[in-house]
Amino acid sequence: MASSSHFLYSHHHSYASYNSKSHFNSFTNATFPQFSSFKPNGSSSFRKKLQSSRIHIIRAAASDPTTGRNQLEVVYDLENKLNKLADEVDREAGISRLTLFSPCKINVFLRITGKREDGFHDLASLFHVISLGDKIKFSLSPSKFNGSFVTNVPGVPLDEKNLIIKALNLFRKKTGTDKHFWIHLDKKVPTGAGLGGGSSNAATALWAANQFSGCIATEKDLQEWSGEIGSDIPFFFSHGAAYCTGRGEVVEDIPPPVPRDLSMVLMKPQEACPTGEVYKRLRLDQTSDIDPLVLLEKISKGGISQDVCVNDLEPPAFEVVPSLKRLKQRIAAAGRSQYDAVFMSGSGSTIVGVGSPDPPQFVYDGDEYKNIFFSEAKFITRSANQWYSEPLSTDESPSFPQDAE
């Protein structure tokens, strides 16, 4: 197996998803003092309820021949009692743990339409969420002043440079809440890939913080706030497919323009493409002149093909990482009958082959591409008021050529 630190994942302890009914039911044969450490916030105390309120089942029994009186049998129904208490915990104690999928995106096309006075560039792009993603586990910290942040890969910043931390700080600033979290980031999306993995993490953190706070902000609020810390973050508050303009923060939801079962393969060499370097080498007089709305219409009517997958950042990215140009050319040549289109996502360095989940055979041959990252993926979307779900039918685990048989 290749020794790339970004793709060797350590085993870690997973937080069990919390289900209060099963938690309480596990104590069916136990005694009440085992609940004594549970002190939920709110107007009432569940411990008092445990001690004072009881649920009984009253059953009529046959008359006693010795007394001639009818008897009543009183049965204490512990299981029913605990189920009702569990429901009250869910209502009054709120969420304590939450695990969310944090998917990445690709740019099906990316036009750069001009440079702004603030130094940023205007773009027009079809963004789409795909099924490769990270998992983030949030646990509510008992402290109102600090939390913790760990991840399974080296090199990921664990301080305020990380977009997750920036997002949570932003949420506290905007809402006045004081909740902090223990966070475990299970990273599968490579960094420096043009896939928006960090932006997705930030959007997921904002969503999680809002859930822990009783959804005090709207999705529109979260989307608008997120633009303050990253241009790509607002997109993830769309439903998964969007036409994005401005710096990327102007997001227009569109109906999914491509089938969600359309397969693709993502291939990324070890070299990253620093976004700043790519934009420095961008020459606007050498970009495409095709109207991005024409590209969007063509995709909506005819699907993905090579002629619509325009990316104005490819030429400068190929200058920054020359081997990336060769990789794209080889994939396109080898996969003429395999892929509908081959293109770079974002500012690189991921090359996307749409139409097949398999990489071309040459990546298995020799040592040149022994450390390449590749993963299959599909297009996904989300429903209103729900976060993205990890598809169950697709294996998005990153792979290495030398791992194949």
UniProtKB/Swiss-Prot annotation:
Enzyme class: transferase
GO cellular component: chloroplast
Keyword terms of this UniProt record: ATP-binding, Chloroplast, Isoprene biosynthesis, Kinase, Nucleotide-binding, Plastid, Transferase, Transit peptide
Domain of life according to the entry: Eukaryota
Involved pathway(s): Isoprenoid biosynthesis; isopentenyl diphosphate biosynthesis via DXP pathway; isopentenyl diphosphate from 1-deoxy-D-xylulose 5-phosphate: step 3/6
Catalytic activity: 4-CDP-2-C-methyl-D-erythritol + ATP = 4-CDP-2-C-methyl-D-erythritol 2-phosphate + ADP + H(+)
Location(s), subcellular: Plastid, Chloroplast
Transit peptide start and end: 1-97
GO biological process, one term: terpenoid biosynthetic process
Sample GO molecular function, one term: ATP binding
Record Pfam families: GHMP_kinases_C, GHMP_kinases_N
Residues noted as binding ATP in the record, renumbered to the chain: 190-200
Coarse class of the protein's main subcellular location: plastid
InterPro entries in the cross-refs: GHMP_kinase_C_dom, GHMP_kinase_C_sf, GHMP_kinase_N_dom, IspE, Ribosomal_Su5_D2-typ_SF, Ribsml_uS5_D2-typ_fold_subgr
Record bears the keyword Protease: no
Gene3D superfamilies per UniProt: 3.30.230.10, GHMP kinase, C-terminal domain (3.30.70.890)
Family assignment from sequence similarity: Belongs to the GHMP kinase family. IspE subfamily.
Role according to the record: Catalyzes the phosphorylation of the position 2 hydroxy group of 4-diphosphocytidyl-2C-methyl-D-erythritol.
NCBIfam families: ispE
Name listed for the protein in its UniProt record: 4-diphosphocytidyl-2-C-methyl-D-erythritol kinase, chloroplastic
Organism: Mentha piperita (Peppermint)
